[in-house]
Protein backbone atom coordinates (compact mmCIF):
# COMPACT_ATOMS: atom_id res chain seq x y z
CA UNK A 1 0.00 0.00 0.00
CA UNK A 2 2.85 2.38 0.82
CA UNK A 3 4.17 2.10 -2.73
CA UNK A 4 0.81 3.30 -4.07
CA UNK A 5 0.78 6.54 -2.06
CA UNK A 6 2.72 8.54 -4.71
CA UNK A 7 -0.09 7.81 -7.20
CA UNK A 8 -2.90 9.25 -5.11
CA UNK A 9 -2.09 12.90 -6.01
CA UNK A 10 -3.01 12.05 -9.63
CA UNK A 11 -6.36 10.62 -8.55
CA UNK A 12 -7.17 13.57 -6.30
CA UNK A 13 -6.16 16.26 -8.79
CA UNK A 14 -8.14 14.76 -11.66
CA UNK A 15 -11.09 14.13 -9.35
CA UNK A 16 -10.99 17.86 -8.60
CA UNK A 17 -10.58 18.78 -12.26
CA UNK A 18 -13.43 16.52 -13.36
CA UNK A 19 -15.78 18.10 -10.84
CA UNK A 20 -14.76 21.65 -11.72
CA UNK A 21 -15.26 21.14 -15.47
CA UNK A 22 -18.58 19.31 -15.17
CA UNK A 23 -20.05 21.46 -12.43
CA UNK A 24 -19.10 24.64 -14.28
CA UNK A 25 -20.97 23.36 -17.34
CA UNK A 26 -24.07 22.69 -15.24
CA UNK A 27 -23.60 25.98 -13.38
CA UNK A 28 -23.54 27.90 -16.68
CA UNK A 29 -27.11 26.82 -17.41
CA UNK A 30 -28.35 28.62 -14.29
CA UNK A 31 -26.59 31.76 -15.56
CA UNK A 32 -28.20 31.38 -19.05
CA UNK A 33 -24.82 31.26 -20.80
CA UNK A 34 -24.43 29.96 -24.36
CA UNK A 35 -22.39 27.00 -25.53
CA UNK A 36 -20.08 29.43 -27.33
CA UNK A 37 -19.41 31.26 -24.07
CA UNK A 38 -18.59 28.02 -22.26
CA UNK A 39 -16.36 26.93 -25.13
CA UNK A 40 -14.42 30.19 -25.02
CA UNK A 41 -14.18 30.03 -21.24
CA UNK A 42 -12.82 26.49 -21.21
CA UNK A 43 -10.47 27.25 -24.09
CA UNK A 44 -9.04 30.33 -22.40
CA UNK A 45 -8.25 28.21 -19.36
CA UNK A 46 -6.63 25.58 -21.55
CA UNK A 47 -4.61 28.27 -23.34
CA UNK A 48 -2.90 29.07 -20.06
CA UNK A 49 -2.25 25.38 -19.56
CA UNK A 50 -0.79 25.01 -23.05
CA UNK A 51 1.43 28.08 -22.78
CA UNK A 52 2.87 27.16 -19.39
CA UNK A 53 3.04 23.34 -19.48
CA UNK A 54 6.43 23.22 -21.21
CA UNK A 55 8.07 26.08 -19.22
CA UNK A 56 6.84 24.65 -15.92
CA UNK A 57 8.02 21.17 -16.92
CA UNK A 58 11.49 22.55 -17.64
CA UNK A 59 11.42 24.64 -14.46
CA UNK A 60 10.71 21.52 -12.41
CA UNK A 61 13.85 19.95 -13.89
CA UNK A 62 15.84 22.83 -12.39
CA UNK A 63 14.25 23.72 -9.04
CA UNK A 64 12.64 20.43 -8.02
CA UNK A 65 9.15 19.03 -8.25
CA UNK A 66 7.40 19.55 -4.91
CA UNK A 67 7.23 23.35 -5.01
CA UNK A 68 5.31 23.40 -8.28
CA UNK A 69 3.07 20.52 -7.21
CA UNK A 70 2.09 22.36 -4.04
CA UNK A 71 1.45 25.57 -5.99
CA UNK A 72 -0.91 23.73 -8.34
CA UNK A 73 -2.92 22.34 -5.42
CA UNK A 74 -3.11 25.75 -3.75
CA UNK A 75 -4.36 27.43 -6.91
CA UNK A 76 -7.14 24.91 -7.63
CA UNK A 77 -8.28 25.37 -4.02
CA UNK A 78 -8.70 29.11 -4.53
CA UNK A 79 -10.52 28.62 -7.84
CA UNK A 80 -12.98 26.11 -6.40
CA UNK A 81 -13.85 28.51 -3.59
CA UNK A 82 -14.32 31.38 -6.04
CA UNK A 83 -16.54 29.67 -8.62
CA UNK A 84 -19.68 29.40 -6.43
CA UNK A 85 -19.51 33.15 -5.85
CA UNK A 86 -19.84 33.93 -9.56
CA UNK A 87 -23.16 35.56 -10.45
CA UNK A 88 -22.47 36.71 -14.01
CA UNK A 89 -20.57 35.52 -17.04
CA UNK A 90 -17.71 37.96 -16.59
CA UNK A 91 -17.22 36.67 -13.05
CA UNK A 92 -16.52 33.24 -14.52
CA UNK A 93 -14.09 34.80 -16.98
CA UNK A 94 -12.13 36.25 -14.09
CA UNK A 95 -12.02 33.03 -12.04
CA UNK A 96 -12.19 29.92 -14.23
CA UNK A 97 -9.10 30.39 -16.44
CA UNK A 98 -6.87 29.95 -13.40
CA UNK A 99 -7.81 26.27 -13.53
CA UNK A 100 -5.52 25.95 -16.56
CA UNK A 101 -2.57 27.48 -14.76
CA UNK A 102 -3.05 25.13 -11.80
CA UNK A 103 -2.94 22.14 -14.15
CA UNK A 104 0.18 23.45 -15.93
CA UNK A 105 1.90 23.68 -12.56
CA UNK A 106 0.86 20.19 -11.59
CA UNK A 107 0.82 17.69 -14.46
CA UNK A 108 4.16 17.99 -16.31
CA UNK A 109 5.90 18.20 -12.94
CA UNK A 110 4.05 15.25 -11.48
CA UNK A 111 4.54 13.02 -14.54
CA UNK A 112 8.29 13.65 -14.53
CA UNK A 113 8.47 13.13 -10.76
CA UNK A 114 6.65 9.82 -11.02
CA UNK A 115 8.79 8.62 -13.94
CA UNK A 116 11.90 9.18 -11.81
CA UNK A 117 10.73 7.39 -8.70
CA UNK A 118 12.46 4.23 -7.66
CA UNK A 119 10.10 1.29 -7.18
CA UNK A 120 9.65 -2.39 -7.83
CA UNK A 121 8.20 -1.85 -11.27
CA UNK A 122 9.64 -0.67 -14.54
CA UNK A 123 8.68 2.57 -16.22
CA UNK A 124 5.81 0.93 -18.11
CA UNK A 125 4.43 -0.59 -14.90
CA UNK A 126 4.59 2.75 -13.10
CA UNK A 127 2.82 4.38 -16.04
CA UNK A 128 0.11 1.74 -15.73
CA UNK A 129 -0.52 2.63 -12.09
CA UNK A 130 -0.39 6.34 -12.89
CA UNK A 131 -2.95 5.93 -15.66
CA UNK A 132 -5.22 3.84 -13.43
CA UNK A 133 -5.20 6.48 -10.69
CA UNK A 134 -5.69 9.61 -12.80
CA UNK A 135 -8.33 7.89 -14.94
CA UNK A 136 -10.24 6.88 -11.81
CA UNK A 137 -10.19 10.49 -10.66
CA UNK A 138 -11.31 12.05 -13.93
CA UNK A 139 -14.09 9.45 -14.18
CA UNK A 140 -15.41 9.75 -10.64
CA UNK A 141 -15.31 13.56 -10.65
CA UNK A 142 -17.93 14.13 -13.38
CA UNK A 143 -20.04 11.26 -12.06
CA UNK A 144 -20.02 12.78 -8.57
CA UNK A 145 -20.89 16.22 -9.96
CA UNK A 146 -23.75 14.78 -12.04
CA UNK A 147 -25.30 12.92 -9.13
CA UNK A 148 -24.94 15.88 -6.78
CA UNK A 149 -27.06 18.02 -9.11
CA UNK A 150 -30.00 16.43 -7.29
CA UNK A 151 -28.82 17.83 -3.95
CA UNK A 152 -30.33 21.00 -2.39
CA UNK A 153 -27.05 22.83 -2.97
CA UNK A 154 -25.64 22.12 -6.47
CA UNK A 155 -22.59 24.25 -5.57
CA UNK A 156 -21.49 21.67 -3.00
CA UNK A 157 -19.17 19.88 -5.50
CA UNK A 158 -17.04 23.05 -5.71
CA UNK A 159 -16.49 22.99 -1.95
CA UNK A 160 -15.71 19.29 -2.15
CA UNK A 161 -12.94 20.17 -4.59
CA UNK A 162 -11.36 22.62 -2.16
CA UNK A 163 -11.22 19.95 0.53
CA UNK A 164 -9.70 17.37 -1.80
CA UNK A 165 -7.11 19.87 -3.07
CA UNK A 166 -5.99 20.65 0.48
CA UNK A 167 -5.75 16.91 1.17
CA UNK A 168 -3.65 16.55 -1.97
CA UNK A 169 -1.30 19.30 -0.85
CA UNK A 170 -0.85 17.61 2.54
CA UNK A 171 -0.12 14.32 0.81
CA UNK A 172 2.46 15.85 -1.51
CA UNK A 173 4.11 17.87 1.25
CA UNK A 174 4.81 14.64 3.15
CA UNK A 175 6.73 13.23 0.21
CA UNK A 176 10.42 13.96 0.63
CA UNK A 177 12.57 15.33 -2.17
CA UNK A 178 14.11 12.61 -4.30
CA UNK A 179 17.76 11.79 -3.77
CA UNK A 180 20.14 10.42 -6.37
CA UNK A 181 19.58 6.94 -4.91
CA UNK A 182 15.87 7.24 -5.63
CA UNK A 183 16.27 7.99 -9.30
CA UNK A 184 16.03 5.51 -12.12
CA UNK A 185 18.78 5.17 -14.63
CA UNK A 186 18.12 7.33 -17.65
CA UNK A 187 18.01 4.21 -19.81
CA UNK A 188 14.65 3.01 -18.47
CA UNK A 189 13.92 -0.51 -19.63
CA UNK A 190 10.45 -1.12 -20.95
CA UNK A 191 10.15 -4.60 -19.48
CA UNK A 192 13.62 -6.08 -19.00
CA UNK A 193 17.24 -5.56 -20.12
CA UNK A 194 16.66 -7.72 -23.18
CA UNK A 195 13.84 -5.55 -24.47
CA UNK A 196 14.02 -5.29 -28.24
CA UNK A 197 13.19 -1.64 -28.88
CA UNK A 198 13.57 -0.66 -32.57
CA UNK A 199 16.28 1.99 -32.69
CA UNK A 200 14.97 3.52 -35.93
CA UNK A 201 11.40 4.18 -34.78
CA UNK A 202 11.21 6.20 -31.52
CA UNK A 203 10.81 9.64 -33.09
CA UNK A 204 8.36 8.35 -35.70
CA UNK A 205 6.08 6.98 -33.00
CA UNK A 206 6.40 10.08 -30.85
CA UNK A 207 5.09 12.15 -33.77
CA UNK A 208 2.27 9.75 -34.64
CA UNK A 209 1.14 9.21 -31.06
CA UNK A 210 1.12 12.94 -30.28
CA UNK A 211 -1.04 13.67 -33.31
CA UNK A 212 -3.40 10.86 -32.33
CA UNK A 213 -3.55 12.10 -28.75
CA UNK A 214 -4.37 15.61 -29.97
CA UNK A 215 -7.45 14.26 -31.78
CA UNK A 216 -8.49 12.22 -28.75
CA UNK A 217 -8.33 15.13 -26.35
CA UNK A 218 -9.97 17.52 -28.79
CA UNK A 219 -12.93 15.14 -28.69
CA UNK A 220 -12.69 14.35 -24.99
CA UNK A 221 -12.78 18.05 -24.10
CA UNK A 222 -16.09 18.38 -25.95
CA UNK A 223 -17.53 15.33 -24.22
CA UNK A 224 -16.50 16.68 -20.83
CA UNK A 225 -17.09 20.41 -21.10
CA UNK A 226 -19.93 20.85 -23.63
CA UNK A 227 -21.91 17.62 -23.48
CA UNK A 228 -23.13 18.13 -19.88
CA UNK A 229 -24.74 21.41 -20.99
CA UNK A 230 -25.85 20.51 -24.52
CA UNK A 231 -27.18 17.04 -23.72
CA UNK A 232 -29.11 18.02 -20.60
CA UNK A 233 -30.35 21.41 -21.80
CA UNK A 234 -31.20 20.69 -25.44
CA UNK A 235 -31.46 16.92 -25.78
CA UNK A 236 -33.32 16.03 -22.60
CA UNK A 237 -30.58 13.77 -21.24
CA UNK A 238 -30.64 13.50 -17.44
CA UNK A 239 -27.41 14.44 -15.60
CA UNK A 240 -27.27 10.95 -14.10
CA UNK A 241 -27.49 9.40 -17.58
CA UNK A 242 -24.55 11.52 -18.70
CA UNK A 243 -22.76 10.30 -15.59
CA UNK A 244 -23.35 6.71 -16.72
CA UNK A 245 -21.76 7.46 -20.12
CA UNK A 246 -18.68 8.91 -18.44
CA UNK A 247 -18.48 6.02 -15.98
CA UNK A 248 -18.53 3.49 -18.81
CA UNK A 249 -15.90 5.36 -20.81
CA UNK A 250 -13.65 5.65 -17.77
CA UNK A 251 -14.08 1.98 -16.86
CA UNK A 252 -13.03 0.93 -20.36
CA UNK A 253 -10.02 3.24 -20.16
CA UNK A 254 -8.99 1.60 -16.90
CA UNK A 255 -9.11 -1.85 -18.49
CA UNK A 256 -7.00 -0.70 -21.44
CA UNK A 257 -4.42 0.88 -19.14
CA UNK A 258 -4.18 -2.42 -17.26
CA UNK A 259 -3.51 -4.17 -20.57
CA UNK A 260 -0.82 -1.68 -21.62
CA UNK A 261 0.92 -2.18 -18.30
CA UNK A 262 1.22 -5.93 -18.84
CA UNK A 263 4.07 -7.86 -20.42
CA UNK A 264 1.85 -9.02 -23.27
CA UNK A 265 1.40 -5.47 -24.51
CA UNK A 266 5.10 -5.21 -25.39
CA UNK A 267 4.42 -6.90 -28.73
CA UNK A 268 2.23 -3.90 -29.65
CA UNK A 269 4.93 -1.31 -29.06
CA UNK A 270 6.30 0.52 -32.11
CA UNK A 271 3.63 -0.90 -34.42
CA UNK A 272 1.07 1.17 -36.30
CA UNK A 273 -2.08 -1.05 -36.34
CA UNK A 274 -2.67 -1.09 -32.54
CA UNK A 275 -2.61 2.71 -32.60
CA UNK A 276 -4.49 3.14 -35.89
CA UNK A 277 -7.49 0.80 -35.65
CA UNK A 278 -8.97 2.05 -32.34
CA UNK A 279 -8.98 5.55 -33.79
CA UNK A 280 -10.65 4.39 -37.01
CA UNK A 281 -13.48 2.63 -35.17
CA UNK A 282 -13.88 5.59 -32.83
CA UNK A 283 -14.15 8.02 -35.74
CA UNK A 284 -17.09 6.02 -37.09
CA UNK A 285 -18.74 5.95 -33.67
CA UNK A 286 -18.43 9.74 -33.40
CA UNK A 287 -20.44 10.11 -36.59
CA UNK A 288 -23.07 7.94 -34.89
CA UNK A 289 -23.16 10.39 -31.96
CA UNK A 290 -23.68 13.21 -34.43
CA UNK A 291 -26.54 11.57 -36.31
CA UNK A 292 -28.52 9.74 -33.63
CA UNK A 293 -29.38 9.80 -29.97
CA UNK A 294 -30.12 6.40 -28.57
CA UNK A 295 -28.81 5.51 -25.10
CA UNK A 296 -27.47 2.11 -26.16
CA UNK A 297 -25.67 3.53 -29.21
CA UNK A 298 -24.15 6.27 -27.10
CA UNK A 299 -22.97 3.73 -24.53
CA UNK A 300 -21.18 1.80 -27.28
CA UNK A 301 -19.65 4.98 -28.72
CA UNK A 302 -18.38 6.14 -25.32
CA UNK A 303 -16.89 2.69 -24.68
CA UNK A 304 -15.07 2.70 -28.03
CA UNK A 305 -13.80 6.18 -27.36
CA UNK A 306 -12.45 4.97 -24.02
CA UNK A 307 -10.35 2.38 -25.86
CA UNK A 308 -8.99 4.94 -28.32
CA UNK A 309 -8.23 7.61 -25.73
CA UNK A 310 -6.40 5.20 -23.46
CA UNK A 311 -4.34 3.94 -26.40
CA UNK A 312 -3.29 7.36 -27.67
CA UNK A 313 -2.60 8.80 -24.21
CA UNK A 314 -0.45 5.86 -23.14
CA UNK A 315 1.43 5.88 -26.44
CA UNK A 316 2.15 9.61 -26.38
CA UNK A 317 3.42 9.50 -22.82
CA UNK A 318 5.34 6.23 -23.09
CA UNK A 319 7.19 6.99 -26.31
CA UNK A 320 8.18 10.40 -24.97
CA UNK A 321 9.49 9.22 -21.60
CA UNK A 322 11.16 5.88 -22.28
CA UNK A 323 14.93 6.23 -22.49
CA UNK A 324 14.79 10.04 -22.32
CA UNK A 325 16.82 12.03 -19.78
CA UNK A 326 14.77 15.28 -20.03
CA UNK A 327 11.59 13.81 -18.61
CA UNK A 328 10.20 17.14 -17.42
CA UNK A 329 10.54 18.67 -20.88
CA UNK A 330 9.08 15.58 -22.59
CA UNK A 331 6.14 15.52 -20.20
CA UNK A 332 5.68 19.21 -20.95
CA UNK A 333 5.45 18.56 -24.70
CA UNK A 334 3.05 15.69 -24.11
CA UNK A 335 0.79 17.90 -22.00
CA UNK A 336 1.09 20.95 -24.27
CA UNK A 337 0.02 19.11 -27.43
CA UNK A 338 -2.76 17.43 -25.50
CA UNK A 339 -3.66 20.88 -24.18
CA UNK A 340 -3.99 22.36 -27.66
CA UNK A 341 -6.65 19.76 -28.38
CA UNK A 342 -8.44 20.59 -25.15
CA UNK A 343 -8.22 24.29 -26.05
CA UNK A 344 -9.64 24.00 -29.56
CA UNK A 345 -12.33 21.38 -28.86
CA UNK A 346 -14.72 23.46 -26.72
CA UNK A 347 -13.91 26.65 -28.62
CA UNK A 348 -14.82 25.31 -32.06
CA UNK A 349 -17.42 22.82 -30.83
CA UNK A 350 -19.36 25.40 -28.82
CA UNK A 351 -19.34 27.88 -31.70
CA UNK A 352 -20.51 25.18 -34.14
CA UNK A 353 -23.33 24.03 -31.84
CA UNK A 354 -24.70 27.58 -31.57
CA UNK A 355 -24.17 28.36 -35.26
CA UNK A 356 -25.95 25.23 -36.48
CA UNK A 357 -28.45 25.14 -33.63
CA UNK A 358 -27.64 21.44 -33.47
CA UNK A 359 -26.31 20.13 -30.14
CA UNK A 360 -24.92 17.04 -31.89
CA UNK A 361 -22.90 18.88 -34.54
CA UNK A 362 -19.69 18.94 -32.44
CA UNK A 363 -19.52 15.14 -32.65
CA UNK A 364 -19.60 15.26 -36.45
CA UNK A 365 -16.72 17.73 -36.24
CA UNK A 366 -14.78 15.32 -34.03
CA UNK A 367 -15.40 12.40 -36.37
CA UNK A 368 -14.16 14.41 -39.34
CA UNK A 369 -11.07 15.63 -37.49
CA UNK A 370 -10.09 12.18 -36.30
CA UNK A 371 -10.56 10.72 -39.79
CA UNK A 372 -8.40 13.47 -41.32
CA UNK A 373 -5.62 13.05 -38.78
CA UNK A 374 -5.60 9.31 -39.37
CA UNK A 375 -4.66 10.08 -42.96
CA UNK A 376 -1.89 12.37 -41.69
CA UNK A 377 -0.57 9.64 -39.39
CA UNK A 378 -0.42 7.12 -42.22
CA UNK A 379 1.36 9.71 -44.36
CA UNK A 380 3.98 10.27 -41.66
CA UNK A 381 4.41 6.53 -41.29
CA UNK A 382 4.97 6.04 -45.02
CA UNK A 383 7.37 8.99 -45.17
CA UNK A 384 9.51 8.33 -42.09
CA UNK A 385 9.47 4.59 -41.44
CA UNK A 386 12.70 3.99 -43.39
CA UNK A 387 14.22 7.43 -42.87
CA UNK A 388 17.34 8.07 -40.81
CA UNK A 389 15.56 11.10 -39.39
CA UNK A 390 13.71 8.80 -37.03
CA UNK A 391 16.97 8.14 -35.23
CA UNK A 392 17.00 11.71 -33.89
CA UNK A 393 15.41 12.48 -30.52
CA UNK A 394 12.10 14.30 -30.65
CA UNK A 395 11.48 17.48 -28.74
Predicted regions and their residues:
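Helix-loop boundary and gating motifs at the non-cytosolic
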Residues: 1-46, 206-208, 212, 217-235, ...
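Transmembrane alpha-helices of Major Facilitator/SLC transporters
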Residues: 47-51, 244-265
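Helix-to-loop junctions at the C-terminal end of transmembrane segments
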Residues: 53-64, 149, 256-270, 353-354
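Structural signature of the two symmetry-related core transmembrane helices
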Residues: 67-81, 272-287
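Cytoplasmic helix-loop-helix junction between adjacent transmembrane helices
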Residues: 97-132
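Intracellular juxtamembrane helix-capping segments at the cytosolic ends
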Residues: 105-118, 310-324
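Symmetry-related core transmembrane helices of the 12-TM Major Facilitator Superfamily/SLC fold
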Residues: 156-173, 363-378
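A late C-terminal transmembrane helix in Major Facilitator Superfamily
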Residues: 326-356
Amino acid sequence: MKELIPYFPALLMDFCLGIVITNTAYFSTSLSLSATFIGVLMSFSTLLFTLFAIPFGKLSDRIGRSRLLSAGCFLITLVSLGLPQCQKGWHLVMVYPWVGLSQALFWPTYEAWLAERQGRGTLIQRLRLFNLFWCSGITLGPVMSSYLQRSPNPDFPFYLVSGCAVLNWLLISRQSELTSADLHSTSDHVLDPANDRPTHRPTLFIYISRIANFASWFTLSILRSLTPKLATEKMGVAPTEYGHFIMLMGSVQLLIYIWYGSKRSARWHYKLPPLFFPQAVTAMSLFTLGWFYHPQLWMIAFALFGISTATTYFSSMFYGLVGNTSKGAQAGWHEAILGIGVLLGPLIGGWLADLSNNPQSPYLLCGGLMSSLLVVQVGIWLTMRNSNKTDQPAQ
